[in-house]
Amino acid sequence: MSIPTETAPTIGRIVHYKLSGHDVSMINLESMQSFGGQGVIRSPAKLGDILPAIITRTYEGTGTAVNLQVFLDGNHSYWATSRSQGSDHGQWSWPPRT
Protein backbone atom coordinates (compact mmCIF):
# COMPACT_ATOMS: atom_id res chain seq x y z
CA MET A 1 0.00 0.00 0.00
CA SER A 2 1.48 3.35 -1.01
CA ILE A 3 1.25 6.56 0.99
CA PRO A 4 -0.16 9.50 -1.02
CA THR A 5 2.41 12.24 -1.58
CA GLU A 6 -0.14 15.05 -1.78
CA THR A 7 -2.97 15.52 0.71
CA ALA A 8 -5.69 18.09 0.14
CA PRO A 9 -5.86 20.69 2.93
CA THR A 10 -9.04 20.49 5.01
CA ILE A 11 -10.45 22.55 7.87
CA GLY A 12 -9.16 21.47 11.27
CA ARG A 13 -5.88 19.93 10.08
CA ILE A 14 -2.68 20.89 11.89
CA VAL A 15 0.18 22.13 9.70
CA HIS A 16 3.53 23.88 10.14
CA TYR A 17 3.79 27.57 9.17
CA LYS A 18 7.05 29.44 8.49
CA LEU A 19 6.91 33.11 9.57
CA SER A 20 7.71 35.80 6.99
CA GLY A 21 9.11 39.25 7.73
CA HIS A 22 5.61 40.73 7.35
CA ASP A 23 4.20 38.17 9.79
CA VAL A 24 6.87 39.04 12.39
CA SER A 25 6.11 42.78 11.99
CA MET A 26 2.36 42.21 12.44
CA ILE A 27 2.88 39.92 15.44
CA ASN A 28 5.16 42.46 17.11
CA LEU A 29 2.66 45.27 16.42
CA GLU A 30 -0.17 43.21 17.96
CA SER A 31 2.03 42.45 20.96
CA MET A 32 2.13 46.15 21.82
CA GLN A 33 -1.68 46.24 22.04
CA SER A 34 -3.82 44.89 24.85
CA PHE A 35 -6.51 42.30 24.13
CA GLY A 36 -9.49 42.28 26.48
CA GLY A 37 -7.52 43.96 29.24
CA GLN A 38 -4.89 41.22 29.16
CA GLY A 39 -1.45 41.92 27.79
CA VAL A 40 0.20 39.64 25.29
CA ILE A 41 2.72 37.30 26.89
CA ARG A 42 4.83 35.27 24.48
CA SER A 43 8.30 34.39 23.30
CA PRO A 44 9.70 36.70 20.60
CA ALA A 45 8.73 35.82 17.02
CA LYS A 46 11.58 35.63 14.52
CA LEU A 47 11.83 35.42 10.74
CA GLY A 48 11.73 31.78 9.68
CA ASP A 49 10.25 30.43 12.92
CA ILE A 50 8.23 27.30 12.17
CA LEU A 51 5.08 27.19 14.29
CA PRO A 52 2.00 24.94 14.50
CA ALA A 53 -1.15 26.23 12.83
CA ILE A 54 -4.67 24.98 12.24
CA ILE A 55 -6.42 25.34 8.89
CA THR A 56 -9.53 27.50 9.41
CA ARG A 57 -10.63 27.91 5.78
CA THR A 58 -9.89 26.39 2.40
CA TYR A 59 -10.54 27.96 -1.00
CA GLU A 60 -11.98 25.65 -3.63
CA GLY A 61 -10.20 25.88 -6.95
CA THR A 62 -7.09 27.59 -5.56
CA GLY A 63 -4.97 24.52 -5.01
CA THR A 64 -3.46 24.83 -1.55
CA ALA A 65 -4.49 28.37 -0.46
CA VAL A 66 -5.81 28.37 3.12
CA ASN A 67 -6.41 30.62 6.12
CA LEU A 68 -4.57 29.65 9.31
CA GLN A 69 -4.60 30.35 13.02
CA VAL A 70 -0.91 30.22 13.91
CA PHE A 71 -0.16 29.25 17.50
CA LEU A 72 2.49 31.50 19.01
CA ASP A 73 4.53 30.47 22.05
CA GLY A 74 2.40 32.33 24.61
CA ASN A 75 -1.18 33.52 25.14
CA HIS A 76 -1.74 34.79 21.61
CA SER A 77 -2.29 33.51 18.06
CA TYR A 78 -1.85 35.03 14.60
CA TRP A 79 -4.30 34.92 11.70
CA ALA A 80 -2.49 34.20 8.43
CA THR A 81 -4.78 34.55 5.41
CA SER A 82 -4.57 33.14 1.89
CA ARG A 83 -1.33 31.22 2.43
CA SER A 84 -0.10 28.58 0.02
CA GLN A 85 1.73 25.34 0.62
CA GLY A 86 5.52 25.39 0.27
CA SER A 87 8.80 25.72 2.11
CA ASP A 88 9.38 29.49 1.81
CA HIS A 89 8.68 32.14 4.44
CA GLY A 90 4.94 32.81 4.65
CA GLN A 91 3.99 29.30 3.52
CA TRP A 92 2.67 26.22 5.27
CA SER A 93 3.71 22.57 5.05
CA TRP A 94 2.58 19.23 6.39
CA PRO A 95 4.41 18.11 9.55
CA PRO A 96 6.94 15.37 8.85
CA ARG A 97 5.73 11.83 9.52
CA THR A 98 7.52 10.10 12.36
Predicted regions, residues:
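Short, well-ordered loop/turn sites that connect or cap secondary structure elements
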Residues: 8-10
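Short, Lys/Arg- and Gly-enriched loop/turn segments at beta-strand edges
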Residues: 22-50
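Intrinsically disordered, low-complexity, charged/polar segments
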Residues: 56-98
